[in-house]
């Protein structure tokens, strides 16, 4: 099968790109993945309960429902959505070649590829994590910290870098107390962030500490089992929230070694846009954004990728017509 443009990924970036491309009558094909990176089609928002910071929903909206609406709009304008995972992609020349997980013997081609596979938060994979995921455990304080289950409660953050410091400081707006659990005896955060963190009256840093288990009543998290790695003393910490701030992994394994990426694996784009060092290959959303990582910024990035892809295809079509008329 040959397509003018395919989109790999089904989060806000992928669907927004699809909507713009479909409205331009380019008949985009969107591969939404089948539990790619352990996440269902729709990306990280499908694991989020209330989304309260996406414009247009003053009362908030459930993450899975928001992604259903994205998908519905993509289909409405003519996007062909395939519930399949792209397992191999060859960017050596155009049209680009790709293969799908269910049939790796069949090669497909596309003139343009929009990569919107996102990034996923690193987890601790501790006992109780699955039970209390989005029931007290989260990987995004900005996304979830204002939720009713966290307001006026004692909360905890795991990590030692700038992200952990930022998330801890953010949570002080809603929490009565924030515990920052740091595995080492010092922070990796910048001096400025560390100073703000250590001087905040609501924040207490617990050094040399790891989380062993998350515990609760079967419905909501209410405490953690923690261990001091120097003394080996195990104790319980009573908190209603545990936020992971131990980094993200961009889902770029498909293209590493082919397209320019930074040291952390994020695709490098040009001048804040979606263009990469390979003509016809665009990146959108968290796959190229290690700073903001919000649904609304991903959607904006997808818009740019859709418009850029449309413009490239239009320019190339115009050049073909000029060459044809010369003959």
Curated annotation (Swiss-Prot):
Keyword Flavoprotein: yes
EC number: 1.8.1.9
Localisation per UniProt entry: Cytoplasm
The record's free-text note on cofactor binding: Binds 1 FAD per subunit.
Residues that, per the record, bind FAD: 10-13, 39-40, 44, 53, 86, 143, 286, 293-295
Protein family (similarity comment): Belongs to the class-II pyridine nucleotide-disulfide oxidoreductase family.
PANTHER family noted in UniProt: THIOREDOXIN REDUCTASE 1-RELATED-RELATED (PTHR48105)
Stated name of the protein: Thioredoxin reductase
Organism: Pneumocystis jirovecii (Human pneumocystis pneumonia agent)
């Amino acid at each position: 099968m040959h397509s003018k443009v395919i989109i790999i990924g089904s989060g806000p970036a992928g669907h927004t790109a699809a909507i713009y491309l479909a409205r331009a009558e380019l008949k985009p094909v969107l591969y939404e993945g089948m539990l790619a990176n352990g996440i269902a089609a729709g990306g990280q928002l499908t694991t989020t309960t209330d989304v309260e910071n996406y414009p247009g929903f003053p009362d908030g909206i459930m993450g899975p429902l928001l992604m259903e609406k994205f998908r519905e709009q993509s289909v409405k304008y003519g996007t062909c959505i395939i519930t399949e995972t792209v397992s191999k992609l060859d960017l050596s020349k155009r049209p680009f070649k790709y293969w799908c997980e269910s049939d790796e013997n069949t090669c497909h081609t596309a003139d343009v590829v929009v990569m919107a596979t996102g990034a996923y938060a690193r987890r601790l994979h501790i006992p109780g994590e699955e039970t209390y995921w989005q029931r007290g455990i989260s990987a995004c304080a900005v996304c979830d910290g204002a939720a009713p289950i966290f307001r006026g409660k004692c909360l905890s953050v795991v990590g030692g870098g700038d992200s952990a410091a930022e998330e801890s400081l953010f949570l002080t707006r809603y929490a009565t107390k924030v515990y920052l659990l740091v595995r080492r005896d010092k922070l990796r955060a910048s001096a400025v962030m560390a100073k703000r963190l250590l001087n905040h009256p609501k924040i207490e840093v617990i050094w040399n500490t790891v989380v062993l288990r998350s515990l609760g009543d079967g419905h909501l998290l209410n405490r953690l089992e923690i261990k001091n790695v120097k003394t080996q003393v195990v104790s319980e910490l009573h908190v209603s929230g545990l936020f992971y701030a131990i980094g993200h992994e961009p889902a770029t394994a498909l293209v590493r070694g082919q397209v320019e990426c930074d040291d952390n694996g994020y695709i490098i784009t040009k001048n804040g846009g979606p263009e990469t060092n390979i003509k016809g290959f665009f990146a959108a959303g968290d796959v190229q954004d290690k700073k903001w990582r919000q649904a609304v910024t991903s959607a904006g990035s997808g818009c740019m990728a859709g418009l850029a892809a449309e413009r490239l295809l239009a320019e190339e079509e115009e050049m073909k017509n000029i060459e044809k008329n010369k003959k």
